[in-house]
Amino acid sequence: MDDDKDTIFTFELYLKSIGYTTVSFFNPIEALGYFNKNFATCSLVITDYGMPQMSGIDLIKKIREKDENYTKKIILISATVKGDILTDYYEELSNLKVNKILEKPMSLETLKNAIRTLIK
């Protein structure tokens, strides 16, 4: 989930090339609707922090309302990881059991390693 089409396209193309099945969204509300309908088949959510319709943190809160046992892995990506996210939202992200925070831009190798660490 990212509102940047280039990021989505790059991630999706790469992840499919290394064997992952992906479903991508530019709109967090549509992503949440898909997640709620397909909860059983989703194992990992990758979401951007800053999006116009809903923040990544708000999206994660909604996901965790459905995923009360924290079974779904979550990677939060952002261009502002070193700033406000880690300082202002650290406790909240910990409570929401965000599994990994990655700073954009990142290498595809970094993304792959983060996913492989979470999904074995």
Per-region residue spans from a language model:
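Active-site residues of response regulator receiver
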Residues: 2, 48
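Two-component/phosphorelay signaling modules centered on CheY-like receiver
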Residues: 5-23, 96
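Acidic catalytic/metal-coordinating carboxylates
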Residues: 6, 27-30, 55-61
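Acidic, metal-coordinating helix/loop segments flanking the phosphotransfer/catalytic sites
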Residues: 24-44
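Short amphipathic alpha-helix used as the core "switch/output" element in two-component signaling
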Residues: 33, 57-70
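Receiver (REC) domain active-site loop signature in two-component systems and cognate sites
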Residues: 51
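Hydrophobic/aromatic residues positioned on beta-strands within the core alpha/beta folds
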Residues: 77-79
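C-terminal output helix
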Residues: 103-115
